[in-house]
Amino acid sequence: MGEEKKPNTDDLEKGAGQKVDMKKEILSWVFYIAFVLVLTWVIITFVGQRTRVDGRSMMNTLHDGDNLIVEKLSYRFSDPKRFDIIVFPLTGKKEYYIKRIIGLPGETVQIDENGNIYINGELLEENYGAETIQNPGRAAKPITLGDDEYFVMGDNRNNSKDSRSEEVGNVKRSQIIGRAWLRIWPLNKFGLLKHQ
């Protein structure tokens, strides 16, 4: 009769070793995926996030469909500056607005019947608006900004819902998500955005 085959201890040890290696591999992948998820959350929450321009209110600087990186870090250490392009939500709404800062906290903003912007009674020298402002909205009368308020406008001045309207009004510092920093799409316009 045939010989009874004894299990090879080397084969048993090899199989057990493969199971341990497989567990280590799975555990390694779980930790890696968890790390990537936490890192992604930290970056989106504290550093920057992607956003898409929806509309024509910032033309000719930004165009409908442009994809941007909104940088959130610098405003943790310094205040927004005049002409920064910021992203903020309207109070109580989930949609985000992208506008340029015109008036800073404590300043008085007014737009005259000729479309000129005045800050504290002095003409603002700027060339972001492509055309003469036709409707000064609530800025036809002087608007004095609070200690934490900003007056914002779209670069497409006659096709922008911004601080001139009652719906948007002055933007509080706490509303500002971050500063539009980098255009990543379309690729032929890839680059840093002009703020100053």
Regions inferred by a protein language model and the residue ranges of each:
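Soluble extracytoplasmic domains of inner/organellar membrane proteins
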Residues: 138-178, 183-186
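Protein maturation boundaries and topogenic segments
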Residues: 1-96, 171-175, 179-196
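Structural motif
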Residues: 66, 81-85, 107, 149, ...
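Short, surface-exposed secondary-structure boundary micro-motifs
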Residues: 73, 91, 114, 122, ...
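Mid-length scaffold segments of soluble, non-membrane domains
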Residues: 96-122
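PP2C/PPM family metal-dependent serine/threonine protein phosphatase catalytic domain
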Residues: 119-137
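Extracellular/periplasmic catalytic domains that process cell-envelope and extracellular macromolecules
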Residues: 61, 79, 102, 110-111, ...
